[in-house]
């Protein structure tokens, strides 16, 4: 099997140069396709129907180049990845100060579904855990539940350039097993962190988690954030540029469940994962990464997805705090692909 070193230089193929980034992604896909460790999420019954061999990698640059390999059009439910983008919509609806009065931005070190609030402020710790995400969803404005859901779906369309559907069986499955989320919501209601529209907000939260996406969508959503909030394919603004830093800051510190510290240390990119098997990762000003594989580690993160992002970050020196000159120049690898 080839290694990244085999792709260091462009190859002269007839009259044009074929650059290696597409081959590099093929190499990574081949390398990790046989990785069968991990477990498909089954605490939501419908999620257990995913096939373990599904595996896709998509990379989209801020100038609109697309590089993909594997099952990049296989749909799955977005799950917790929705939290980052709904957080951005709440910021647009209410502004930074008000949103931060309801939801903090501190990592917890606890499981994503922990029933725990900040003892001093009674806020959920951050928008990426379930309690914080429920509080964030509660902030989405609209005259009724239908309008609020429509606004979330329209927001997704701005990021991806296409209409999205909800997987109704997954929504109903999550709703029927959602007593823990209901307990969180009522605890927050007791402290005035959410409105009294508990059942409406919980339904909306379960619906946003059941939105169908694929790896291409996740790469484009990340590329949109990397591009200052403007979709690099459609040119449509998906989020006010002033709130992009809020979203990706919390993704960096809290986006990978209780493995977020390890992720920030080893990968160093703003990212969000979901138990459906997706990961979206942002390389500011450069590109977005979207991966899909439903085999999860004990933290709830896609094992193959984590490996892919770690490889790309290390091989091209993309860690946000990297100060060493990378061995490979990303721009050279990206240009000239066909």
From Swiss-Prot:
EC number: 3.5.1.2
Superkingdom of the source species: Bacteria
Protein species of origin: Microcystis aeruginosa (strain NIES-843 / IAM M-2473)
Similarity-based family: Belongs to the glutaminase family.
UniProt-annotated binding residues for substrate: 80, 130, 174, 181, 205, 257, 275
Catalytic activity: L-glutamine + H2O = L-glutamate + NH4(+)
GO biological process: glutamate biosynthetic process; glutamine catabolic process
Protein name stated in the entry: Glutaminase
Keyword terms of this UniProt record: Hydrolase
GO-annotated molecular function: glutaminase activity
Pfam entry (one): Glutaminase
Subunit structure: Homotetramer.
């Amino acid at each position: 099997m080839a290694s990244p070193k085999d792709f260091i230089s462009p190859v002269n193929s007839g009259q044009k140069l074929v650059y290696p980034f597409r081959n590099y992604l093929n190499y990574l896909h081949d390398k990790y396709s046989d990785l069968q460790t991990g477990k498909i999420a089954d605490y939501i019954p419908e999620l257990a129907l995913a096939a373990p061999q599904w595996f896709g990698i998509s990379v989209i640059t801020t100038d609109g180049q697309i590089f993909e390999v594997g099952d990049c059009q296989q749909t799955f439910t977005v799950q917790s990845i929705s939290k980052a983008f709904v957080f951005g919509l709440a910021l647009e609806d209410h502004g930074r100060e008000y949103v931060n009065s309801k939801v903090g931005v501190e990592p917890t070190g606890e499981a994503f579904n922990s029933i725990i609030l900040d003892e001093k402020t009674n806020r959920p710790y951050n928008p990426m855990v379930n309690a914080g995400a429920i509080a964030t969803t509660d902030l989405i404005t609209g005259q009724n539940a239908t309008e609020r859901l429509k606004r979330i779906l329209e927001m997704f369309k701005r990021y991806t350039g296409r209409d999205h559907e909800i997987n109704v069986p997954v929504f109903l499955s999550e709703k029927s097993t959602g007593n823990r989320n209901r307990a969180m919501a009522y605890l927050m209601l007791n402290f005035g962190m959410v409105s009294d529209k508990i059942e409406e907000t919980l339904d909306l939260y379960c619906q946003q988690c059941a939105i169908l996406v694929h790896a291409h969508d996740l790469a484009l959503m990340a590329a949109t954030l990397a591009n200052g909030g403007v979709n690099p394919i459609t040119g449509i603004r998906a989020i006010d540029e002033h709130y992009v830093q809020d979203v990706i800051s919390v993704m960096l510190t809290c986006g990978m469940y209780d493995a977020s510290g390890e992720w920030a240390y080893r990968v160093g990119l703003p990212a969000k994962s979901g138990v459906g098997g997706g990961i979206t990762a942002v390389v500011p000003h450069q590109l977005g990464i979207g991966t899909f594989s439903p085999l999860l580690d004990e933290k709830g993160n896609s094992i193959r997805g984590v490996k892919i992002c770690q490889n790309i970050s290390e091989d091209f020196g993309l860690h946000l705090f990297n100060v060493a000159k990378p061995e490979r120049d990303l721009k050279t690898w990206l240009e000239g692909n066909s």
